[in-house]
Curated annotation (Swiss-Prot):
Documented EC number(s): 2.7.2.11
Protein name per UniProt: Glutamate 5-kinase
Pfam families xrefs: AA_kinase, PUA
Annotated organism of origin: Methanococcoides burtonii (strain DSM 6242 / NBRC 107633 / OCM 468 / ACE-M)
Main location: cytoplasm
Coiled coil spans: none
Gene: proB
CDD domains: AAK_G5K_ProB, PUA_G5K
Subcellular location: Cytoplasm
Biological process according to GO: L-proline biosynthetic process
PUA domain span: 284-360
Kinase found in the keyword field: yes
Length: 375
């Protein structure tokens, strides 16, 4: 049996994600008692010297209730309007909850693009670090009113976003609170014989198959995005726990080592921060390479045009692209040539680049220090 106390008991920097179904009652109203309980537990950790970052869903669900929409809106502008209406109310309640314990909070609204531009990401990291140094509790949510891809895929879901925050802030632990007890081998709402997994050592295809689909009207009830979040944590050296928010004193009990929910162990190999940024950032396209090029990249060599078979998508110099071989994406990198330039020089030798393009910026397509390979 895994000794959780030894693994996560000493976590110093902790990201806690509160799901929509945890923060809302059945009638759609905010669960103020739950929010107060979270604030109380966080204040205890704060007094113990731990740094806490809160990621809170719920703005769209609140907006749905305030606007009396009745059911989940299909139109993206309506969802975004609901988020805009609900976000202020959400922060007001969090502010009041933490003020009872003498703590200040700060609102931070993010999109996944916040992590793609490295300068923006570094500024974000510095801002959050400064807030933590002043004893402020950062409360992060997705900036739904300006998001299209994220909001279309999930309704107010912050699982992957919270994992990105944990990764970028080099957190020790991510806790995902939801409305079920953890990861099961099948849907417990449909199968009485479903077995709860207490520990996941490795995210295998079998583990991935346990991911479900969105089932909740105001949030996401499935496990697919939570497993995706665990993948991000795995390569970032961050442990992750999925737990039921209805459990009394859940945060304290998790840190005390109780077998609550599902614990995802982390990879012992952790990428450097810059490489982690490359791997986790959104890609603009793909470069398809041959087997020889893939083997060369595994030996820490740069990608040359001779190893390029083709490109997919449209991208510019400096964009992050996927690296693909035999139909499998095995890494990401920062390209030094555009997609149009690569179409012209793919499969060519470096001494042919200038003759083909009329100029040559680099001998390589992707420089070795700008490549992050999946493990």
């Amino acid at each position: 049996m895994t000794n959780r106390k030894e693994i996560i008991g000493d976590a110093e920097k902790i990201v806690i994600k509160i799901g929509t179904t945890s923060i809302s009652r059945e009638d759609g109203s905010l669960n103020n008692e739950f929010m107060d309980t979270i604030a109380s537990q966080v204040s205890e950790l704060h007094r113990a010297g731990k740094q806490i970052i809160l990621v809170s869903s719920g703005s769209i669900g609140i907006g749905i209730e305030i606007l009396d929409l009745g059911c989940r809106p299909k139109e993206i502008p309506v969802r975004q309007a609901a988020a805009a209406v609900g976000q202020g109310v959400l922060m007001q309640h969090w502010t009041e909850a933490f003020q009872k314990y003498g703590l200040n909070v700060a609102q931070i609204l993010l999109t996944y693009d916040s992590f793609t531009n490295r300068l923006t990401y570094l500024n974000l990291r510095n801002s959050i670090s400064t807030l933590l140094s002043y004893g402020v509790i950062p409360i992060i949510n997705e900036n739904d009113p300006i998001c299209v891809h994220e909001i279309e895929a999930t309704l107010g879901d912050n699982d992957k976003l919270s994992a990105m925050v944990a990764s970028k802030m080099e957190a020790d632990l991510l806790i995902l609170f939801t409305d079920i007890d953890g990861l099961y081998d099948k849907n417990p709402k449909r199968h009485d014989d479903a077995v709860l997994l207490r520990t996941v050592e490795e995210i295998t295809p079998t583990i991935e198959s346990y991911g479900g689909n969105p089932t909740s009207m105001k949030g996401v009830g499935g496990m697919r995005t939570k497993i995706d979040a665990a993948k991000i944590c795995n390569i970032s050296g961050c442990y992750m726990v999925i737990a039921n928010s209805n459990v009394d004193d859940g945060i304290r009990r998790i840190l005390d080592g109780e077998e609550l929910g599902t614990l995802f162990l982390t990879n012992q190999f952790v990428h450097k921060n810059r490489i982690r940024w490359i791997i986790l950032a959104r890609s603009s396209g793909s470069i398809v390479v041959d087997t020889g090029a893939k083997e060369a990249l595994a030996k820490r060599m740069s990608l040359l045009p001779s190893g390029v078979l083709g490109v997919a998508g449209t991208f510019d110099r400096g964009d992050i692209v996927k690296l693909e071989c035999d139909g499998v994406v095995f890494g990401k990198g920062i390209t030094d040539y555009t997609s149009e330039e690569l179409k012209a020089i793919k499969g060519k030798q470096t001494n042919e680049i200038a003759d083909i393009l009329g100029y040559k910026n680099y001998d390589h397509v992707v420089q070795k220090d700008n490549i992050g390979l999946f493990k």
